[in-house]
Amino acid sequence: MTPGELRRLYLIVRVFLSYGLDELIPQMRLTLPLRVGRRLLFWMPNRHADKPLGERLRLALQELGPVWIKFGQMMSTRRDLFPPQIADQLTLLQDRVAPFDGALARKHIELAMGGPLETWFDDFDQQALASASIAQVHTARLKTTGQEVVLKVIRPDIRPIIKADVRLMYRLAAWVPKLMPDGRRLRPREVVREYEKTLLDELNLLREAANAIQLRRNFDGSPMLYVPEVYSDYCRESVLVMERIYGIPVSDIPTLEKQGTNMKLLAERGVQVFFTQVFRDSFFHADMHPGNIFVSYEHPEDPCYIGIDCGIVGSLNKDDKRYLAENFIAFFNRDYRKVAELHVDSGWVPRDTNVEDFEFAIRTVCEPIFEKPLSEISFGNVLLNLFNTARRFNMEVQPQLVLLQKTLLYVEGLGRQLYPQLDLWTTAKPFLESWMRDQVGIPAVIRALKEKAPFWAEKLPELPELFYDSLQQHKLLQQSVDKLTNQMQAQRVRQGQSRYLFGVGATLLVSGTILLSGDVEVFPAWLIAAGIVSWVIGWKRTT
């Protein structure tokens, strides 16, 4: 380790110990060297013993800085790995840091654009509009049209910080299986690898621009969701330029109510937007926390969401969507056998899983949920319970489903914050059932024919030739089979003859040997010689 890494590791250890996070390690895992080491660090006592463990973990991550804050935010979505009291605290982590100097932002933008800022923009505001751990946002106007825009620029110093902290995370991850009872199940190195990929994706703003363009296209003209326009000609890997929007933060309930917003419709549209993204488009915004969602000032009686920050998106393939929709419908129909079979058929759990045992486990965990009124049942917790039960039956972690679960929890929490009486199932069920009918009915057949029509139109002129080639190949195959059959029959005949000759040879050898013990001298020698000849001929037949 470099001196810089050693200093950073010392700081991490000091912060962890000052918040008493050594309590995460069970006493039975504290070996003698660890106990001695902890006592030697007596000047690092737990200074927050009055606070619960989950809160202490959150405060420690906040003190360690933006990379660790984002790591905690990601881990808050992995409720299969942590008890609720810790996961709930991690969701409270705020990705807010002081902005860096606007003059430095201007210099970084000019470096990325390859010229003076005034070439493309007017009225650039060096005071940041918003600031987070990875990037910050400034306002300006396009020189050509006067359109108000925002420029999102990556922090110049963030890459080396991320690389250094991620390297330390890998080193610490190697110790987790040794120190924690569930260490192997947590798969710490995979968790760090997933986090590293997420961070690197967020550092490439061209990826975010492409995501925003796709999402905007999917909801073009929709009254439910508006996505600001991206000006891709001005975008670079470290700079994103998009339309500036004005809206009410979705978490600002008093302002929404004062505006006269139809809160019931707004909450229901949040659910509809989510299921439309997942099942219609197979492309969903996976970072839909309140800081990224606004509500348009226009038409409060017919409210429209505004979505920003498309750095993290998820997608489901056709099979995942179908299995997920069928799982939801089967669960709310309390058909646990169907739920178990769907998990096996989808490959989410191994094929050799005992379906009866799996069904019983799902029933045991999920049946108590129906003690509540249907309107109070949490979709996100349903999904969480299903996945946690499935993991006991060796379900592999599905990254796309983890993202989906996280987003669903966001959407559900947001919807009930806006309108506490929101019945998520009543809102979602018609959509899911309609989507399922569309997938298996006549429209699905017609759609499949349309999709395949260009392929068959291209192949149609070739069909006679393909048919002739197929007949020729069948003929050649039949000839090969006949030849092989004849060879096998000839081989069986030779094997039969060989066995006969071996038997005759053995008889002659035994007879000659017996007669040699008598007074006859020449005749037995001939018998033995004949036996040897029979053996040689039989051996030749076999080869």
Curated annotation (Swiss-Prot):
Gene Ontology cellular-component annotations: plasma membrane
Molecular-function annotations in GO: ATP binding; protein kinase activity
Keywords, comma-separated and alphabetical: ATP-binding, Cell inner membrane, Cell membrane, Kinase, Membrane, Nucleotide-binding, Transferase, Transmembrane, Transmembrane helix, Ubiquinone biosynthesis
Compartments where located: Cell inner membrane
Primary location recorded for the protein, binned into one broad class: membrane
EC numbers for this chain: 2.7.-.-
SUPFAM superfamilies: Protein kinase-like (PK-like) (SSF56112)
Transmembrane intervals: 498-518, 519-539
Enzymatic class: transferase
Positions that bind ATP: L129, A130, S131, A132, S133, I134, A135, Q136, V137, K152
Source taxon at top rank: Bacteria
Pathway: Cofactor biosynthesis; ubiquinone biosynthesis [regulation]
Active site: D287
Annotated membrane topology: Multi-pass membrane protein
GO biological process, one term: ubiquinone biosynthetic process
Domain Protein kinase: 123-501
Protein purpose: Is probably a protein kinase regulator of UbiI activity which is involved in aerobic coenzyme Q (ubiquinone) biosynthesis.
Family per similarity comment: Belongs to the ABC1 family. UbiB subfamily.
Descriptive protein name: Probable protein kinase UbiB
UniProt organism field: Serratia proteamaculans (strain 568)
Gene designation: ubiB
